[in-house]
């Protein structure tokens, strides 16, 4: 056991952790050179295309150190994007240490900081590594000082390496062996294994990635899941070398997989504890807190026949992504669908893209909203995440919106732009600290403003240098109202949104103008109105197409022309009473892109 090292790599997006993991695998001979693909661990197509890591993956490598001993390194790759910090906390729960990888050209960024604090809170040993020292703009001394200044861990003798060229990889491995503690646990105690991740394989059923904390799990053992009490047989246990490799048993401190032919999807929830069915442990391991969705959106299939397959797809996906939550929803405009809770907008895009890609569905998403706390006049408290569930104004005592604490790191030359952006988003400045060239800002910002497009705007006002990390702190009373869109006097529920009263006119006008461009002209006038309660705040009209009925009259009497025009007018009026307007797909998407 003292030769096992469990660690993960924490880094900001694009600081090179996937490349570094490739090198570690290569040096330890996990794969032959022929099988070595770039970013081995980013196995999803989507991950490769966007160049980001979404799912945590694990690998077990054997490394022969300079002192002649052979160590087993279990290493878990983690995502770096702010939306996936939950995946990171799960990976860290299974480790004793973490490599903090920092790009020697870029320096420390907010996300690195957030994940690093998570690691330090869990009492992990954090080992700084300066990556990309082959770049001409690398300044290892400055960055090492920055790590000490901002993060507060010893970094003067941090390992310097370049994952791309392979320089310094040996030192990284030596440092892991020297600095990261070996796992603690009792091989004789009853089995306790933490489920770090689980996914569905259509051939094997549910595959669970586990970390053995105490005891031993042998192939063929009967084990039970502690939260559900269900028992299964361990058909196969083994490790990833990135390929699956069966073993006779998983010992204390190891990280590996268990396949037990679990068919139903929620059979092995992530964060749960496995123990033996006979002589099991009394209490489960402290898991990690459930991730709470920050953003909600209705998702509907374009053709109603896909509803069943959409539901199955969501079930399979939610197995793989523990933070996904959903419930059925119906809309008069879009039919049947689901209300899905996401961690953030990137998460939302990725889930939608995975559904469309891996399950071949055509989907349409309504505008994302956050969860509001509503105090009713009779003293009840409701939580509303769907604008159409909001009670009428006269029943509402007060609306409270979620406030998040946003920590922003930005180079000082872009400070002005970022502060302007935060004020525009109704933010309140709480703190501002200078660290060398960087400024750390802390703002309280309404969650609704952050989830829409704050991240993209922040990146664009600071040329990509600012970085953001946020977490929910409290609900705060706010003057929020529901903006409805009426088309020919009919409410379209899927277009409603909850916004702040100060934005009504601005948003309302922008919305109706956008809809006017997108709704095709009919044979009659279409009135598009934006209203709050019964008060219309903006309107525009899609003019009717008309036939020139007087074209065949030449000269002649004016009353003849009047008669024809009058007849046309009556026809249009009758059509307008009967006609209903199709709202095209683009119109729903336009609501999402209003701010641009």
Swiss-Prot record:
SMART domains: EFG_C. Keywords: Cell inner membrane, Cell membrane, GTP-binding, Hydrolase, Membrane, Nucleotide-binding, Protein biosynthesis. GO terms for cellular component: plasma membrane. GO terms for biological process: positive regulation of translation. It is found in: Cell inner membrane. Its main location: membrane. Its EC number is 3.6.5.n1. The keyword Cell inner membrane applies. It catalyses: GTP + H2O = GDP + phosphate + H(+). Belongs to the TRAFAC class translation factor GTPase superfamily. Classic translation factor GTPase family. LepA subfamily. Required for accurate and efficient protein synthesis under certain stress conditions. May act as a fidelity factor of the translation reaction, by catalyzing a one-codon backward translocation of tRNAs on improperly translocated ribosomes. Back-translocation proceeds from a post-translocation (POST) complex to a pre-translocation (PRE) complex, thus giving elongation factor G a second chance to translocate the tRNAs correctly. Binds to ribosomes in a GTP-dependent manner. This is Elongation factor 4.
């Amino acid at each position: 056991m003292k030769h096992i090292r469990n660690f993960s790599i924490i880094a900001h997006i694009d600081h090179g952790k996937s490349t570094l993991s490739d090198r570690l695998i290569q040096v330890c001979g996990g794969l032959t050179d022929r099988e070595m693909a770039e970013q081995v661990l980013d196995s999803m197509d989507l991950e490769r295309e966007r160049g980001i890591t979404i799912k945590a993956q694990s690998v077990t490598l054997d490394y022969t150190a300079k002192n002649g001993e052979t160590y087993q390194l279990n290493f878990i790759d983690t995502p770096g994007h702010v939306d996936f910090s939950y995946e990171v906390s799960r990976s860290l729960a299974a480790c004793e240490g973490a490599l903090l990888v920092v790009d020697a050209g870029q320096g420390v960024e907010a996300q690195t900081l957030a994940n690093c604090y998570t690691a330090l809170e869990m009492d992990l040993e954090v080992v700084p590594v300066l990556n990309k020292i082959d770049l001409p703009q690398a300044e290892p001394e400055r960055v090492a000082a920055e790590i000490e200044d901002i993060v507060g861990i010893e970094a003067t003798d941090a390992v310097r390496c370049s994952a791309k060229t392979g320089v310094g990889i040996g030192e990284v491995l030596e440092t892991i062996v020297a600095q990261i503690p070996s796992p603690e646990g009792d091989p004789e105690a009853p089995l306790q294994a933490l489920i770090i991740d689980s996914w569905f394989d259509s051939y094997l059923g549910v595959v669970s990635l586990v970390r053995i904390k105490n005891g031993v799990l042998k192939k063929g053992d009967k084990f039970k899941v502690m939260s559900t009490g269900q028992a299964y047989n361990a058909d196969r246990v083994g490790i990833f070398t990135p390929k699956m490799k069966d073993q006779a048993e998983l010992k204390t401190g190891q990280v590996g997989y268990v396949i037990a032919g679990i068919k139903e999807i929620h059979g092995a929830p992530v964060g749960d504890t496995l123990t033996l069915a006979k002589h099991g442990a009394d209490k489960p391991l402290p898991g990690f807190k459930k991730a709470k969705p920050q953003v909600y959106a209705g998702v509907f299939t374009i053709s109603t026949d896909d509803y069943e397959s959409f539901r199955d797809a969501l079930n399979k996906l939610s197995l793989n992504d523990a933070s996904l939550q959903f419930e059925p929803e119906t809309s008069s405009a879009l039919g049947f669908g689901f209300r899905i809770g996401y961690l953030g907008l990137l998460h939302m895009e990725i889930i939608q893209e995975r559904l469309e890609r891996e399950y071949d569905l055509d989907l349409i998403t309504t505008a994302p909203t956050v969860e509001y706390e509503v105090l009713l006049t009779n003293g009840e408290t409701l939580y509303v995440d769907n604008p159409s569930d909001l009670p009428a104004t006269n029943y509402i005592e007060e609306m409270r919106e979620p406030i998040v604490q946003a920590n922003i790191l930005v180079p000082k030359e872009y400070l002005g732009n970022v502060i302007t952006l935060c004020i525009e988003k109704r933010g309140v400045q709480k703190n501002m600290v200078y660290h060398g060239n960087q400024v750390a800002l802390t703002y309280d910002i309404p969650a609704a403003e952050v989830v829409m497009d704050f991240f993209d705007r922040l990146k664009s006002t600071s040329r990509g240098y600012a970085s953001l990390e946020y977490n929910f702190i409290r609900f705060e009373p706010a003057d929020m109202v529901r903006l409805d869109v009426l088309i020919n006097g009919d409410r379209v529920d899927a277009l409603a949104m909850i916004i702040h009263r100060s934005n009504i006119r601005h948003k309302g006008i922008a919305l109706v103008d956008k809809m006017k461009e997108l709704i095709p002209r009919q044979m009659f006038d279409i009135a598009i109105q934006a209203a709050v309660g019964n008060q219309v705040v903006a309107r525009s009209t899609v003019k009717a197409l008309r036939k020139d009925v007087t074209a065949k009259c030449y000269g002649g009497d004016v009353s003849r022309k009047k008669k024809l025009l009058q007849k046309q007018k009556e026809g249009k009026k009758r059509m307008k009473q009967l006609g209903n307007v199709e709202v095209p797909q683009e119109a729903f998407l336009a609501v999402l892109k209003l701010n641009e």
